[in-house]
């Protein structure tokens, strides 16, 4: 909450409202705050609407993808929020569900869709349709799994033998066998593969850079933009994009804008509030072990954008 500064009052947009913890804290910070909470998971949205009902019209729930924030504000006749927050990744409601397929702790259909009501492909659908090379590529790219080719080979071999992977247990067991035993395993061998499939199914990295630009453009002058990410791929994008909007040319990431040379669209529109990502301390990790990999980055929109030539 420190970086959002909700005590100032105004409109805040919680782009991934989940169970509403952040939204509740924003609403409690000042009687002058309002929150629009966005989520593509209708179950989470319904639970949050009930949880925050006592705030009345100060909270409004919208069933949509966080990347639709510009359209939502336009439809509602709202403009220039004081703050925008995006807490990326899987919510506790999704991860703890025994039926949604996000976790290998439960034997469930291999779904992984954040919006189970959508017509999008499930994780099982992807593994049934994609060729071996594409499965290996997505597991390596999104999961940074060094055994991606071997895992993909085993998945396709099982499919060709008339045994397609359709449940979380089947996938977790196959990955454990394919990866083989290694000493000092600190995480389950299927963790990276599950992450990769979830990212692919929900297209989590697609247009993330464009979302940053949209959010910054929507903010009022001095408005705050805060993003919490949970894996290195997201955090890398957030770091690069915030630096680009702070005027650091990504053509040469060490330099400020050189107007005649820059082709990456760098501009000085924000002040970065977090020189390094903010990570949870040991007390917070003990209270919430899932926060261990969280990284928070924040920026403040400048009152006047500084041109490339200045």
What are these regions (language model features)?
Residues 1-310:
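S-adenosyl-L-methionine-dependent methyltransferase catalytic core, i.e., the SAM/SAH-binding region
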């Amino acid at each position: 909450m420190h970086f959002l500064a909700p005590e100032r009052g105004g409109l805040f947009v919680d782009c991934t409202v989940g169970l509403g913890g952040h939204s509740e804290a924003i609403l409690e910070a000042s009687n002058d705050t309002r929150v629009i909470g966005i989520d593509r998971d209708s179950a989470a949205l319904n639970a949050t609407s009930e949880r925050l009902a006592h705030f009345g019209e100060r909270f409004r729930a919208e069933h949509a993808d966080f990347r639709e924030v510009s359209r939502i504000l336009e439809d509602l006749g709202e403009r220039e929020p004081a703050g925008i927050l995006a807490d990326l990744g899987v919510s506790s409601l999704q991860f703890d569900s025994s039926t949604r397929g996000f976790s290998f702790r439960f034997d469930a259909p291999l779904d992984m869709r954040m919006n189970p009501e959508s017509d999008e492909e499930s994780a099982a659908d992807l593994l049934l349709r994609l060729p071996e090379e594409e499965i290996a590529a997505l597991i390596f790219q999104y999961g940074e799994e060094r055994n991606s080719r071997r895992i993909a080979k085993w998945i396709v071999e099982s499919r060709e033998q008339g045994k397609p992977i359709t449940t979380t247990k089947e996938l977790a067991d196959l990955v454990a066998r394919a990866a083989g035993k290694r000493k000092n395993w600190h995480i389950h061998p299927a963790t990276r593969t599950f992450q990769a499939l979830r990212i692919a199914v929900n297209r989590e990295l697609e247009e993330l850079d464009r979302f940053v630009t949209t959010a910054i453009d929507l903010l009022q002058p001095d408005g705050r933009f805060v993003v919490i990410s949970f894996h290195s791929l997201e955090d890398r994008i957030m770091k690069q994009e915030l630096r680009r909007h702070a005027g650091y040319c990504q053509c040469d990431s060490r330099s400020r804008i050189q107007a005649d040379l820059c082709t990456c669209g760098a501009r000085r529109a924000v002040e970065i509030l977090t020189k390094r990502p903010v990570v949870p301390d040991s007390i917070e990790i003990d209270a919430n072990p899932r926060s261990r990999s969280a990284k928070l980055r924040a920026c403040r929109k400048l009152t006047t954008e500084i041109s490339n030539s200045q």
